Amino acid sequence: MKHNRLAIAALAPVLILVGCSTPLERRQASGGFDYLEQPAPTPLVVPAGLDAPRLSREFDIPKLGDNAERDVVGPRLDVRPPLQVLPLAPGTRIQDGVDSITVLVESNQDDIDLAQEIHDTLLKFLDDKSINVARDDSGVIVTDWIENEEVIGKSWFRDKVYQIRQRYEFDTVVKDHGRSGSITIELVDHEEGLDGVDDSIVLTDADRRRYAIDMLNNAIAYMNFERQQRQATQELLNGRGIKTELGFDSDENTAFVAEASFDQVWRRMDKVLPLLGFQVRDLDQQLATYFVDYEPDGGFWASLWGDNDELPLEEGPYQIRLEPMGERTAITLMDNEANPLPTETVTQMYNRFAELLQKESRDLQ
């Protein structure tokens, strides 16, 4: 047993680190940088009296542009493919002609405040990634330090750990009309190094842009997930049947009271009213009112059972007003002068109206 301990002790000094390359090395070309030591080629000198040979220019290296970074060569040259902003979420697109890293966002649901949606989505995204927020004020969200560590070498004594620490700023703006806005991102702090911060590592503008684009793309992907989930939920709710009972609106007028939100009932009325013989000639969601003409010959019930089962209404113009009442919605039937219809008339219409609202959306096609 003593011999084994001595053998292990003898091997320990010659242990070498085994690991992968650092993040800094992964952006560099493989194969070394001996080409940096190569002298500039000398032009071919043709003696007097001889014709110069024809030379192909196919493989000539173009001259650097005026704005090119001339010292970005060798290990400083990033060989990774470029990143670009990917506007994958519904209602997002790239803002052209700007140097900032920005994505434009448009509202895709009228009942959702766009500024609040963008703000809440970014906070939920950061929370999902376990990223703390250092500042959240007036449309600007600044993250706390985001730390990523990677073990790139192991020994019996300790691991070699490469650490990257970053902070980002999201700047959100929504136009006054509330239908469109933008998200701009910037990498505001960056530190990295092997077993500690290496102050000699200075990010280029391209590096900063690359990190920021990657973070923004992750945020947009999260928004895509959120919007698709919300749309799927809304479609499910819109397709369900809606229970209705006789009741009163806020003015104590006899009305149909639907067990659904205003938006659900508003969308459903487009399908229900024509089946009852109402032709929609105008609608105003701000007024929460459908302006209709009652034409019983064109209705679902008249075509199915005949004239004896028409609604107890005279042909002509009417108004149908919706009123949100918490999680329920009142539906008030009125004449063309916005006078509520008599209680007896509304009661006689209830069964047919309630039966159609109770049907699922696919059964109303």
Swiss-Prot record:
- Could you list this entry's UniProt keywords, alphabetically sorted: Cell outer membrane, Lipoprotein, Membrane, Palmitate, Signal
At which residues is a lipid of type N-palmitoyl cysteine covalently attached?
C20
> How does the UniProt record describe the way this protein sits in the membrane?
Lipid-anchor
Chief localization = membrane
Signal peptide (UniProt feature, chain positions)? 1-19
Q: Which GO terms describe its cellular component?
A: cell outer membrane
Is Signal given among the entry's keywords? Answer: yes
- Entry-linked PROSITE patterns: PROKAR_LIPOPROTEIN (PS51257)
Task: Give the highest taxon in the source lineage.
Answer: Bacteria
Where does it live in the cell? Cell outer membrane
BP-aspect Gene Ontology terms = Gram-negative-bacterium-type cell outer membrane assembly; protein insertion into membrane
Name the lipidated positions (S-diacylglycerol cysteine). Answer: C20
Functionally, this protein is described as follows:
Part of the outer membrane protein assembly complex, which is involved in assembly and insertion of beta-barrel proteins into the outer membrane.
Q: What is stated as this protein's family in its record? A: Belongs to the BamC family.
Subunit structure and binding partners: Part of the Bam complex.
* Protein name per Swiss-Prot or TrEMBL: Outer membrane protein assembly factor BamC
Q: Which organism is it from?
A: Ferrimonas balearica (strain DSM 9799 / CCM 4581 / KCTC 23876 / PAT)
Lineage at the top is: Bacteria, Pseudomonadati, Pseudomonadota, Gammaproteobacteria, Alteromonadales
